[in-house]
């Protein structure tokens, strides 16, 4: 957990000068596995020899209520490097395929009754994503991706 927070802090510090760039965005998303999430993404192309690379900080949460007494919660936070594939794959200018790889920390909570009343745990691992963004307007993108925390996901990104 401390490694993730340290990495997020460093990413924000090193990309803070890029906050005014038009390709930075904040996004919200929802998956078909009932995961809700949000992310901040900062363009670091200038720091990466003008490669189409960005840093994404994300938070995702899943809650399943099994009955009136039992609830399972999973929350993930992390950081990922995102590579825009438009320099490799020639598509419409409004379409931006991408892939990403990063680290995430996941916390689990089981609340219930009986022999196993409560359980909490923390784990960490790789975060893998790939998808496509479609520019609706210069300020709004639709984002469709597949990742290993939430599965098939749809969302919207708002550039700042």
Which functions belong to the PLM regions below?
Residues 22-33, 52-63, 99-105, 137-149:
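Transmembrane beta-strand segments that form the barrel wall of outer-membrane beta-barrel proteins
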Residues 21-23, 53, 57-74, 105-124:
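Flexible, solvent-exposed loop segments that connect beta-strands
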Residues 63-107:
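Mid-chain, structured segments of secreted extracytoplasmic proteins
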Residues 20-23, 45-52, 86-96, 139:
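Short loop/turn motifs that connect adjacent beta-strands in outer-membrane beta-barrel proteins
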Residues 149-160:
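Outer-membrane beta-barrel "beta-signal"
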Residues 1-23:
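Cleavable N-terminal export/targeting peptides
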Residues 30, 42-46, 81-87, 132-134, ...:
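Residue-level signature of outer-membrane beta-barrel architecture
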Residues 25, 37-41, 78-82, 127-129, ...:
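Membrane-embedded beta-strand positions in outer-membrane beta-barrel channels/transporters
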């Amino acid at each position: 957990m401390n490694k993730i927070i340290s990495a997020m802090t460093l990413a924000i510090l090193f990309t803070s000068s890029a906050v005014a760039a038009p390709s930075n965005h904040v996004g919200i998303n929802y998956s078909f596995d009932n995961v809700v999430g949000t992310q901040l993404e900062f363009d670091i192309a200038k720091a990466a020899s003008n490669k189409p690379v960005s840093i994404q900080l994300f938070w995702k949460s899943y809650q399943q209520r099994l009955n009136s007494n039992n609830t399972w919660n999973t929350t993930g936070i992390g950081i990922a490097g995102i590579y825009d594939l438009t320099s490799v794959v020639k598509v419409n200018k409004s379409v931006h395929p991408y892939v990403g790889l990063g680290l995430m920390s996941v916390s689990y909570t089981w609340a219930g009754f009986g022999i196993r009343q409560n359980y909490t745990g923390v784990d960490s691992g790789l975060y893998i994503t790939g998808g496509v963004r479609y520019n609706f307007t210069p300020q709004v993108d639709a984002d469709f991706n597949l990742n290993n925390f939430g599965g098939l996901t749809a969302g919207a990104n708002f550039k700042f």
